[in-house]
A protein has these predicted regions:
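Short small-residue beta-strand/loop micro-motif enriched in glycine and branched aliphatics
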Residues: 82-86, 147-149, 173
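Acidic/histidine-rich, metal-coordinating catalytic segments
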Residues: 91, 109-127, 150-152, 204-207
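RNase H-like polynucleotidyl transferase catalytic core
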Residues: 115-118, 136-159, 176-178
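A structural motif
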Residues: 72-75, 137-141, 159-166
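C-terminal domain-tail junction helix/linker
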Residues: 45, 142-144, 165-217
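An active-site-proximal beta-strand-loop segment
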Residues: 49-84, 94
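Basic, flexible linker segments flanking DNA-binding modules
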Residues: 1-59, 120, 130-139, 209-215
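Active-site beta-loop-alpha junctions of metal-dependent nucleic acid enzymes
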Residues: 66-69, 85-113
Length: 217
């Protein structure tokens, strides 16, 4: 107590560095969202979709001068981590429908279910009991199940959220865009790289390798 000027946490840290095992004074409670989900067995069983607003610092030229914004739609197959991304100028349900059509053409497998948050680009669940969101109409017509995560629980869409953080780190921190065409041109190159990047969660394989192995069975 007397003659020691460091905090308890500092003392514990120093003891661990010297190889002295000390129990924590208080065990950390488990996080509420530390839970396991059912293992997926095939590509397309569940696809997470979300939208990322392109950072304002990445805009240049007319798109910035006119006060416009750009948005990245992202889909990630939970089984293989294989992704598809596309940029739009407006954050609307109609663009979600356009993205779905592009996604169906891009993914070489049948999409059985998609999982999204409760944003109005995906659902009118909390604003209208009578009017159906165009995105949900498109899903129903395509025979794709729509799963909605509980409100304010982004960790339920954790795979697409993490992929957006990687996009920020490896893409948006380095790129600038004058319009949506330039965004999509550069996104195509980034997508090719990210789908070929080895991942620890896939045992050192890339999403493309994981997908090809699954489709070859």
């Amino acid at each position: 107590k007397y003659g020691y000027g460091r905090s308890l946490s500092g003392m514990v840290y120093a003891a661990r560095r010297m190889g002295i095992c000390m129990a924590d004074s208080k065990a950390k409670p488990p996080r509420k969202h530390d839970r396991r989900y059912p293992e997926l067995l095939r590509p397309g069983e569940k696809v997470q979709i979300d939208v990322k607003e392109v950072p304002y610092s990445c805009l240049k030229g007319a798109v910035k001068q006119d006060g416009k914004r750009l948005y990245q739609w992202t889909a990630i197959d939970e089984f293989s981590r294989y992704r598809f991304v596309y940029g739009f100028e407006e954050h609307t349900p109609e663009n979600s429908v356009k993205f779905l059509k592009l996604l169906e053409a891009a993914f070489p497998f049948k999409i059985e279910a998609v999982q999204t948050d409760n944003g109005t680009e995906f659902t009118y669940r909390y604003i209208s009991e009578e009017k159906e969101c165009p995105f949900e109409t498109a899903l129903r017509e395509a025979g794709i199940e729509h799963r909605l995560i509980p409100p304010r629980t982004p960790w339920h869409n954790g795979k697409v959220e993490r992929s957006h953080r990687n996009d920020q780190r490896y893409f948006y921190d380095w790129e600038r865009f004058g319009d949506v065409d330039e965004l999509n041109h550069k996104l195509r190159e980034h997508l090719e790289w990210s789908n070929r990047k080895p991942m620890r969660t896939l045992g050192g394989k890339s999403p493309m390798q994981r997908l090809h192995e699954a489709l070859a069975v």
